[in-house]
Structures are given as structure tokens and as C-alpha cells.
Amino acid sequence: MHNTSTTGSLLLAALATTLAPAATGADDRGALLERIDELVSDSMEATQTPGISVAVQHRGDLILAKGYGLADVENRVPATEHTVYRIGSVTKQFTAAAVMKLVEEGKVALDAPITEYFPDYPVGEFHITVGQLLDHTSGIKGYTEMPAFWEQSRLDLSHEQMIELFSAEPYEFEPGDRYQYSNSGYYLAGLLVEKASGKSYAEYLEETFFRPLGMRESHYLYSGPIVPNRAEG
């Protein structure tokens, strides 16, 4: 599933070029749909992506909503326009937006030290801000880079256990010195959303983004509940 973002990037670039004639009426709808099918198939083959769902909208007109390939390879379940996919690290966009929403409400400050929200976090001599969590300049080691995490990844670790896992690691660099992608930083940012809002991360996203924007098929991923039309892989 790690190829999904690459496939999406290829498609966005290709579709932008394909839709340009549509604005002037140069291509008829049938030819346009055939071209989109061709682009999707080529991108899936190039990235070895088993399944994908595509929606194309142009100036308010829904041109296409369609699934390609398989949502479940083992059981040969086809992907449709209703297939629900895990979005992985795209979740960080929602986390950052949630933090910024709380900044607008005066409940969070980007330049505030993280110890304001996590008093027991071992920052040592460093000063780490909320903003540095969001822009990957905190220097906190990413837990996905740690063998110890993968050894326990199937366990239902508590927030305290997760923080203990990566907070014990040496800093990768002095905070603010450079950029380095860190899932740990965004783990803390997600917890900050809960602390500042007084709601669970899932509740805050539902109330702030999903429901107001009509994102009826967007969910927070729990291991227990059944999600209709969820892709497997």
C-alpha cells in the first residue's frame, strides 16, 4: 500500500494535462473517460498498485467516480468508488489542520514549548516547540525507525507506553537545526489535539472536519469495528 501516494501523484499530474482540453470542449466525454482509464491503468502498472479508486471533478461537474483493480487481492474483491482505504501518513494533514484550528481558537500556540502540554517529556537542555513537531524539526527520533517498535507493533500499546518508547532515545539533532521526518513528532501532535480540545482525536476530527465537510465515508481507524467496503492489504 506504500505505492498509493506515488500513484496518486502520477495521476494528478496526468489528469491535470488531460482535463485541460475539456475546459474548451475539445474532447468529447467518451474520449475523455477512455483517456482517464488509460492513465489509471498505466499508473497502476508502473507502481504495481493492486487497486485504486478515482474521482475526477471539473468545474463542479463529476466526470468520473470509479474503482480500478482489487480492494482485496486474496479474495478477489474489486475496488469501487465506495472502497475505503487506509490513508497512512496522509493523516498528518488532518493532525496539522486540527492543531492549527486550535491555534485559531487560542487553545494552542505554535511557539509554545511542548512541555507546556507534556510536562514530563524529557527535553533535557533543548527547547522544542509545537511548531517543530509539525514541521519535522524537533529532533525527536521517529518510532518507525526503531526495531523495538516493530517488535511490539501488534500490541495495543497505551499512549504512555508509546511515548516511553521513543522519548528514551537520544535526539537525532538539536531542535530546529534541520528537517527529519518523524512519526513520533506527529504522535505527540495528535495527543496535543486531545489535551487542548478535551476530546478524543477521533471525535475532534469527526466534529471539526468529517461531519461539516460531508466526508461520510471517512473514519478513524480502530482495529475492532467493522468498516464497510474497507480495502485489505
Model-derived features with residue positions:
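Bacterial N-terminal signal peptides
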Residues: 9-18
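Bacterial Sec-dependent signal peptides at the C-terminal "C-region" and cleavage site
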Residues: 17-28
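Short, surface-exposed loop or secondary-structure junction motifs
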Residues: 72, 125-233
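Short, glycine/proline-biased beta-turn/loop segments that scaffold the active-site neighborhood
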Residues: 110-124, 211-213
